[in-house]
């Protein structure tokens, strides 16, 4: 018997800090939106990482959130590849169109990964760092594993009629459910004499 893990099943939900009780299991898989940097542009890798960390902390309400590292990496990747037209494969269980990323203006970077539902409204987050203001406007794609039971998943996916839209089925079909080998250990109980 072969054991393997496939990519997690994903759905579209609001940013994780707007949820309660499940923050410890959140994983950001992808995002769709635009990063705008006004003022001092990041030129070195250190500056790009610092800007990305500041933006991720502003979105997640601090740097202790479980999604902080993955979101920082996502933003830093966009700032790194944004200076020229690049094609980046954001990762998929089947061949997916590569994502073009470009600077529309010297201070603006856009990125559009895998299909995201247009009915989920984009949100805007702004943070000020030394000599610059960074703004992200867009949507997030998270792992469904942190949403909990199916009831919660349906409730969250049902925002703006998403559960009844063709996009919901498309997203469900597009991403595979993660297969996990679960080992359960029972606490030994004392048998009666």
From Swiss-Prot:
Domain of life (superkingdom): Viruses
InterPro entries: Rhabdo_matrix
One GO term describing the cellular component: membrane
Location of the protein in the cell: Virion membrane; Host endomembrane system
Molecular function via GO: structural constituent of virion
Role this protein plays: Plays a major role in assembly and budding of virion. Completely covers the ribonucleoprotein coil and keep it in condensed bullet-shaped form. Inhibits viral transcription and stimulates replication.
Note: Most abundant protein in the virion.
Protein family per UniProt: Belongs to the novirhabdovirus matrix protein family.
Name of the protein in question: Matrix protein
Organism: Hirame rhabdovirus (strain Korea/CA 9703/1997) (HIRRV)
């Amino acid at each position: 018997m072969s054991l393997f893990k496939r990519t997690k099943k994903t759905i579209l939900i609001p940013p994780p800090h707007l949820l309660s009780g499940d923050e410890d299991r959140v994983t950001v898989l992808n995002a769709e939106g635009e990063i705008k940097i006004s003022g001092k542009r990041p030129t070195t890798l250190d500056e790009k990482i610092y800007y990305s960390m500041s933006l991720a902390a502003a979105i997640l309400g601090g740097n202790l959130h479980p999604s902080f590292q993955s979101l920082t990496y996502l933003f830093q990747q966009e700032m790194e590849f944004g200076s020229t037209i690049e094609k980046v494969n954001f990762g998929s269980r089947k061949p997916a169109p590569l994502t073009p990323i470009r600077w529309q203006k010297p201070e603006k970077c856009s990125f559009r990964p895998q299909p995201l539902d247009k009915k989920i409204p984009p949100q805007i987050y702004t943070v000020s760092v030394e000599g610059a203001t960074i703004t992200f406007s867009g949507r997030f794609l998270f792992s469904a594993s942190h949403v909990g039971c199916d009831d919660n998943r349906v409730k969250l996916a049902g925002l703006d009629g998403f559960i009844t839209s063709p996009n919901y089925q498309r997203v469900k079909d597009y991403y595979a459910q993660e297969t996990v080998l679960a080992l359960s250990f029972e606490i030994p109980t004392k048998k009666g004499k």
